[in-house]
């Protein structure tokens, strides 16, 4: 991208951006929640739309001069509704966390009981963690995975729901590698007359392309981020049934946010448009293929995959048998140019700052053009680095850099 002005006005900051650019260019990015946006997304975010205040919603603003940003937001909403066959869409949430907060506030009262997935079993901070607003403002109880299969125990979920009769059941996850049965969860919600909310932040791209069953027909509310598998700007969005539209919109503004970020909403419109194209479906299909191959190769090297494998874009790996913690593995792999994140595993025995596992995903490397052969090489690099962690790994680092050079991030930037 062109940084001519920044070069003249703030070379100190530009130097930091350039260092991060180099890190992204020459590292294999395996953090499951990260991706690389298109140049079109970045251009939209860097546009003069950032100058415009637009409190309210299209055609009902609290400021003048909003006729063109109204068009932008309308475009984003219509594309998002089309992408997921939804009745109503709100594209103003600044993040997935704020999207979740708005849904809770739209129909619940402080202190109401909500059933959500345990964070250490693959849930998310905003699904009831005691250190998060969700756990502080609401009475969250949790469900998790079966100890043997390491997949969601729907019977136990139902039992907990019947015993506690929560006002809402939240599903969706940040570290769960299997298909989620939204129909089953809907049936449980109906049995206890509870709202159903799905946080599909991680799997939105899979849902959009039919590679994971859609929660939209079943859920009252669906939240997502726009920067993971959707490959857009950092931000959030909410889909809901038409009957909840006013309550959701009111919860976002004036409930928890003021002015929307119109430059980000423009970038969301771009990414929704990209996700409606056929080449995006091919991309997501390759993500799933890559993840399966990477998982099988790692299993061949003796890594234990939580639940035995994957149905989506990510893998959760128990490193106990490799005699290394998630924290140490993250640091080690980072030193050779592979970026992962430490992650708790179900029935974790270590601190969340240490962890027994790591979480990896293929959306970012697939965006670069990596395919099955590269997945085999990544598995080799990971295994070799961990098995030979006391040795000099400069050769591995160099090989990783060479692969990255073959698949440059932005060829025409």
From Swiss-Prot:
Enzyme class: transferase
Cystines in this chain: none
Site (Plays an important role in substrate specificity): residue numbering on this chain: 227
GO biological process: glycine biosynthetic process from serine; tetrahydrofolate interconversion; tetrahydrofolate metabolic process
Subcellular location: Cytoplasm
Modified residues (N6-(pyridoxal phosphate)lysine): 228
Subunit structure and binding partners: Homodimer.
Protein family according to the UniProt entry: Belongs to the SHMT family.
PANTHER family: SERINE HYDROXYMETHYLTRANSFERASE, SERINE HYDROXYMETHYLTRANSFERASE 1
Name of the protein described by the UniProt record: Serine hydroxymethyltransferase
Source organism per UniProt: Clostridium botulinum (strain Hall / ATCC 3502 / NCTC 13319 / Type A)
Highest classification ranks of the organism: Bacteria, Bacillati, Bacillota, Clostridia, Eubacteriales
